Swiss-Prot record:
This is AP-2 complex subunit beta. It comes from Homo sapiens (Human). Residues 841-937 are annotated as: Interaction with ARRB1. Gene3D superfamilies: 2.60.40.1150, Leucine-rich Repeat Variant (1.25.10.10), TATA-Binding Protein (3.30.310.10). The modification N-acetylthreonine is found at T2.
């Protein structure tokens, strides 16, 4: 009889009987009792009260019974840690058993018992097992180290287990090597900068030797490890590729994908014009095609990975498009993936076959698949210009079928074709207008309205058509309302005499009867534009539109490179990096493809190899000396009266009596400051409705929404003989200002004010003298706006944005430090070209990339982008990947340091992920603080 009998009992109150059986003298009875306990545990019954009795059964030579007891222990040790200690002696004894199976079983079980009290007893047995004579024990112990590290990382390092793991890479048994690699890889995932694996040519050679002899899962561990290695040159990369290539013919699809991952990464390092490179591309195609003959689930995973490969290197599968033709019995999820890849591989050579297939798919019964097929025809027209006419003809044939969802999808697609090829296929508009009554989906209605508005001059009854949509204006979706508003304004600009009443009607509906702020705002913009300057309105609304791109759903190149490094993992199926869906993975080191420095192949990068290096090199910040000591020991001369200065003649004015100038060996404030940094005179602010509405409420010349840190007390009165200074920094009209408030809390008046800065990280100095021309009487305050520039001497401070200031008056000299918020150092020309951004991101070393969490932020991507742009942080590109908004941004500091940023925003998640890359990574922490401040204010 099988063991299933243990699961069929319905007895009540059997714990007492089991307890008696567990203490029976006969071995067979005890084994039967333990099986019953395990069965009860499996179906969810609480048998924890039998813990001492089950532990007593550990003292046996029967391997089956021992396994059952260990299984029980693993399940209940966490809930009964004090009782689990009882089993420690038995574990230690089993680790020295003559039978290697029992030794391995004992160390594996101890690793699975996640109880801190037990881990300290595990160290000695584990150390012995790592050096055990039997390879089965050694490979089990290797995995145990990773489990122990997860429980107590510090103890693993202190006990030297990581060194023992590294030694196992040179083990004679390939499975021991594979498990050691797996354990080290797992540990290094959570410690990305630890370099635990120490991958060098010698170790790589050992791994490649073991690769041929270990099991399939061992091969996967080794291949994944190889994919993290960066060969020193293309010769080494080719050597590794030659030894990995045989794995492409393996029966296990996971091994094949891991091998593909290694080869895809190392292809980056091979010369594009070499014979081996082209041969390797040809070798990659057959195994990928073979994966599509497996089960549907395997096919889907393979297709998701192939989608990435085709985006990176379409030439690999360009001759294999037929394997992606849909079969009638494919599940819908496989069909949709195949369709996507077909479009990516479509070219002038195969477009006839592809269109014939797509037309057939459009007659299927599955609505989602049909919609995607119709959309695919439009994508073909946009991608392959020579096929556009044939695609339009195919779409017209589909419209004639009068199948509602086919017609609606076709109209959406035709709108995009009109955008791509303006003034070419407008003859079909009449056919489209025949189907107006059947359109009930927002996308289709919006597309049709756009077409009517765009080509209103060619449609005789355009006003009647748009008026028919206007009848149910408030019942339409926002998308349709916005499109209709714009279309009627276009119609008015083309036929003003005939449509004046219509445009007034839609503007009234949008501005007075609508609760939607987007619609209302657009309505007001059009209304003001039309009423003030119709000529400008025409130029704005009827301006030439940019052509739409061929591929609108391509993955961003930097993300694509990262996903290529994760082929065969869940990230490649989700098309998201691991930190987007694995909880607590924000510290994981992000992977990137290597850069082949020996090639100037423009196909690899959208710009030449010199693009990134042509950027302005950041100023090197020298190390900080012992500045504070010198600053506090200034030999101050007699006070100097500061005249009212209208020009910039500053060379003769030594603000602090010569001490600070002698410290730095030159005047802090240059004798002549370029006009670029000359402060603009600040006009008096006269309150008026329009001024307040548009600009002056945010400060003269400051971008609306520009962040200004709240004023802080820099120098308390108790430390400055009654003088209190509070302040902040601002950035206005391209200039930096130090906004200060001086308060006299002493009993005597204060005069003869002067200010000077110490050397600092960004060379910040005053552009003009401190302009306090009247005595500061007791209990009086005065606001001072001091213009600054960054032409002064540079010395690295700690922290980096620290500014040491000396202020003099008729009483004494006072010293204080304040922190410059880095956003005031962001310059206006910090917007990179898109291609330069991509090349620079790749060129900056991966170790310079730092990742931060911006928590509790509830803004959408557009608001975030707008807020940051007001502070000279420019959004280069915005993508939506699987519902996640990704903003790619650049900014530039006054000293020429560029910072590149990737901001990930998941709608509904208040925590954003910010990745920063720059050539001076010590700046990143301060940039993150600025991002956090801007977005939370």
């Amino acid at each position: 009889m099988t063991d299933s009998k243990y699961f069929t009992t319905n007895k009540k109150g059997e714990i007492f009987e089991l307890k008696a059986e567990l203490n029976n003298e006969k071995k067979e009875k005890r084994k039967e009792a333990v099986k019953k306990v395990i069965a009860a545990m499996t179906v969810g019954k609480d048998v924890s009260s039998l813990f001492p009795d089950v532990v007593n059964c550990m003292q046996t030579d029967n391997l089956e019974l021992k396994k059952l007891v260990y299984l029980y222990l693993m399940n209940y040790a966490k809930s009964q840690p004090d009782m689990a200690i009882m089993a420690v002696n038995s574990f230690v004894k089993d680790c020295e058993d003559p039978n290697p199976l029992i030794r391995a079983l004992a160390v594996r079980t101890m690793g699975c018992i996640r109880v801190d009290k037990i881990t300290e007893y595990l160290c000695e047995p584990l150390r012995k097992c790592l050096k055990d004579e039997d390879p089965y024990v050694r490979k089990t112990a290797a995995v145990c180290v990773a489990k122990l590290h997860d429980i107590n990382a510090q103890m693993v390092e202190d006990q030297g287990f990581l060194d023992s793991l590294r030694d196992l890479i040179a083990d004679s048994n390939p499975m021991v090597v594979a498990n050691a690699v797996a354990a080290l890889s797992e540990i290094s995932e959570s410690h990305p900068n630890s370099n635990l694996l120490d991958l060098n040519p010698q170790n790589i050679n050992k791994l490649l030797t073991a690769l041929n002899e270990c099991t399939e899962w061992g091969q996967i561990f080794i291949l994944d490890c190889l994919s993290n290695y960066n060969p020193k040159d293309d010769r080494e990369a080719q050597s590794i590729c030659e030894r990995v290539t045989p794995r492409l013919s393996h029966a296990n699809s996971a091994v094949v994908l891991s091998a593909v991952k290694v080869l895809m990464k190392f292809l980056e390092l091979l010369p594009k014009d070499s014979d081996y490179y082209n041969m390797l591309l040809k070798k990659l195609a057959p195994p990928l095609v073979t994966l599509l003959s497996g089960e549907p689930e395997v096919q889907y995973v393979a297709l998701r990975n192939i989608n990435l490969i085709v985006q990176k290197r379409p030439e690999i599968l360009k001759q294999e498009i037929k394997v992606f033709f849909v079969k009638y019995n494919d599940p819908i999820y496989v069909k949709l993936e195949k369709l996507d890849i077909m479009i990516r591989l479509a070219s002038q050579a195969n477009i006839a076959q592809v269109l014939a297939e797509l037309k057939e798919y459009a007659t299927e019964v599955d609505v989602d698949f049909v919609r995607k097929a119709v959309r695919a025809i439009g994508r073909c027209a946009i991608k392959v210009e020579q096929s556009a006419e044939r695609c339009v003809s195919t779409l017209l044939d589909l419209i004639q079928t009068k199948v509602n969802y086919v017609v609606q999808e076709a109209i959406v697609v035709i709108r995009d074709i009109f955008r791509k090829y303006p003034n070419k296929y407008e003859s079909i508009i009449a056919t489209l207008c025949e189907n107006l009554d059947s359109l009930d989906e927002p996308d289709a209605r919006a597309a049709m309205i756009w077409i009517v508005g765009e080509y209103a001059e060619r449609i005789d009854n355009a006003d009647e058509l748009l008026e028919s949509f206007l009848e149910g204006f408030h019942d339409e979706s926002t998308q349709v309302q916005l499109t209709l508003l714009t279309a009627i304004v276009k119609l008015f600009l083309k036929k003003p005499s005939e449509t004046q009443e219509l445009v007034q009607q839609v503007l009234s509906l949008a501005t007075q009867d609508s609760d939607n702020p987007d619609l209302r705002d657009r309505g007001y913009i059009y209304w003001r534009l039309l009423s003030t300057d119709p000529v400008t309105a025409k130029e704005v609304v009827l301006s030439e539109k940019p052509l739409i791109s061929e591929e609108t759903d391509l993955i961003e190149p930097t993300l694509l490179d990262e996903l290529i490094c994760h082929i065969g993992s869940l990230a490649s199926v989700y098309h998201k990096p691991p930190n987007a869906f694995v909880e607590g993975s924000h510290g994981i080191h992000r992977k990137h493809l290597p850069i082949h420095h020996g090639s100037t192949d423009a196909g690899d990068s959208p710009v030449g190899t010199t693009t990134a290096t042509n950027l302005e090199q950041p100023q090197v910040i020298p190390s900080q000396g012992d500045l504070l000591g010198d600053l506090l020991n200034l030999d101050l001369g007699p006070p100097v009266n500061v005249p009212q200065v209208s020009s910039m003649q500053m060379g003769a004015v030594d603000l602090l009596g010569g001490g600070l100038d002698s410290l730095v060996g030159q005047s802090f404030i240059p004798s002549s400051v370029p006009a670029t940094f000359a402060p603009s005179p600040t006009p008096a602010v006269v309150s008026s409705g329009l001024n307040d509405l548009f600009e002056l409420s945010t400060g003269i010349g400051m971008a609306p929404g520009g962040y200004v840190a709240p004023k802080a007390v820099w120098l308390p009165a108790v430390k400055a003989k009654g003088l209190e200074i509070s302040g902040t920094f601002t950035h206005r009209q391209g200039h930096i200002y130090m906004e200060m408030n001086f308060t006299n809390k002493a009993l005597q008046h204060m005069t003869d004010f002067a200010i000077q800065f110490n050397k600092n990280s960004f060379g910040v100095i005053p552009s003009t003298p401190l302009a306090i021309h009247t005595p500061l009487m007791p209990n009086q305050s005065i606001d001072v706006s001091l213009p600054l520039n960054t032409l002064g001497p540079v010395m690295k401070m700690e922290p980096l944005n620290n500014l040491q200031v000396a202020v003099k008056n008729n009483i004494d000299v006072f010293y204080f430090s304040c922190l410059i918020p880095l956003n005031v150092l962001f310059v206006e020309d910090g917007k990179m070209e898109r291609q330069v951004f991509l090349a620079t991101w790749k060129d900056i070393p991966n170790e310079n990339e730092l990742q931060f969490q911006i928590k509790e932020c509830h803004l959408n991507a557009d608001t975030v982008s707008s807020k940051l742009q007001n502070n000279n942080v420019y959004t280069i590109a915005k993508r939506n990947v699987e519902g996640q908004d990704m903003l790619y941004q650049s900014l530039k500091l006054t000293n020429g340091i560029w910072i590149l940023a990737e901001l990930r925003i998941q709608p509904g998640n208040p925590n954003y992920t910010l990745s920063l890359k720059c050539r001076a990574p010590e700046v990143s922490q301060y940039i993150y603080q600025v991002y956090d401040s801007i977005l939370k204010n």
